[in-house]
Amino acid sequence: MKNPSLHRYATRPGLYFTDDGGADAVVRSETADQVWFCVLEPLDQPSAFYADAARLFNEPGLTFIDQAKKQRICTRRIPSLNLRETLFRMDGPNYGLWYVHVPQAWDGMQYGYRVNGPWDPNHGVSFNPYKLLLDPYAKGIEGKMELDPGAFAYECEIKNGKVAGSPFGPMSTVDSLGHMPVSVAIDDRDINKHMGEPSHPHVPWSKTVIYELHVKGFTANAPWLPPELRGTYACLLYTSDAADEEDS
């Protein structure tokens, strides 16, 4: 069997802005049946995807997830939260990755994922499409977790500040939106975006190197440090012109 060719953006998980004004979203799941990339917008503002998405309406006996399964791109209104959620059905899995190109994306865009699949907690599988999931590769997060039944994948109640319910019980069909944080897209392609803000270097992750070292071994013979500070944690607080020259 011939393996399918990789898409241009199906190389590593994350959200990547593209030159056409959109973004490529990639997430990993080898066991999901379906994955949606979900964009959240204020309800009182025009949607960026008005011309692309099918509208979902409240229909008796038909949930928004059931409707979303039939559409490539769909949107729903959530008046109680003043939000509009647009769901993009992702392609996959391709080598364990799901991917989609979003036609429009912007710095500060709120988003998340919904994933459909088996509900079998006894075997470690707890897919629940009614729960918005954070992007594990998100560069920003906004909001907070609430102690609310909607925040849990299984049916439960909150009694006296404690959760009453079993994680091995029935799947919850309460939407988690409004009870959990959401992912935030950060456009860090412009390395000069935050020039003049010395409180944070704002180095793009694509140009960042994380270097792990042992303080004692790294500084024991450092010529730019006073002898009494070499090999100690105190040297981490030391600054001088010599140290700046060494760093450069």
Question: How would you label these PLM feature ranges?
Answer:
Residues Y238-S248:
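Single conserved hydrophobic/aromatic residue that forms the stacking wall/gate
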